[in-house]
């Protein structure tokens, strides 16, 4: 269940490159698609779940042909079912949000890079709710970052991240 990146040029030529190498084998749909966002003037930021031998969430930067950040960076707490990442890049600032769950609560965790994904500030739990909730989505509006999140208890939330 590895991922690939496809580039299509103006003549509709397609170049497909393998993007992850976890080797996870599953005979089902795990409902964990990757998150991808353009990385400034070049390349892409990508976050994904791998359920193989080293299960968890991973982040990397790819230029479309090869990994720029290697090895991929692990993030999230697997003990709290970290999953469903969302990515947003605004200039050199990269936002990475994901969901974690414990016995009764759901959390949204946010990590920020200010240098195009090379280094990351410490991840912080920024929202909490009891009961069921949707997955986080990061949205850009007027060059600012927002979190979109829907919960059973607290309803829909649209939160400025700065």
PLM features: what roles do these ranges have?
Residues 1-162:
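Extracellular, repeat-based ectodomains that mediate carbohydrate processing or recognition
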């Amino acid at each position: 269940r590895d991922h690939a990146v496809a580039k299509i040029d103006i003549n509709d030529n397609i170049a497909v490159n393998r993007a992850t190498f976890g080797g996870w084998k599953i005979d089902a749909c795990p409902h964990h698609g990757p998150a991808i966002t353009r990385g400034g003037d070049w390349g892409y930021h990508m976050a994904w779940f791998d359920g193989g031998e080293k299960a968890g969430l991973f982040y990397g930067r790819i230029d479309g042909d090869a990994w720029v950040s290697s090895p991929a960076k692990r993030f999230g707490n697997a003990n709290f079912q970290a999953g469903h990442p969302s990515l947003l890049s605004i200039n050199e600032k990269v936002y990475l949000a994901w969901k974690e769950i414990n016995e009764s609560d759901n959390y949204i965790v946010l990590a920020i890079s200010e240098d195009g994904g090379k280094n990351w500030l410490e991840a912080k739990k920024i929202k909490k709710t009891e009961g069921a909730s949707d997955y986080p989505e990061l949205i850009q509006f007027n060059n600012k970052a927002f979190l979109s999140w829907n919960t059973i208890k607290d309803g829909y939330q649209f939160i400025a991240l700065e």
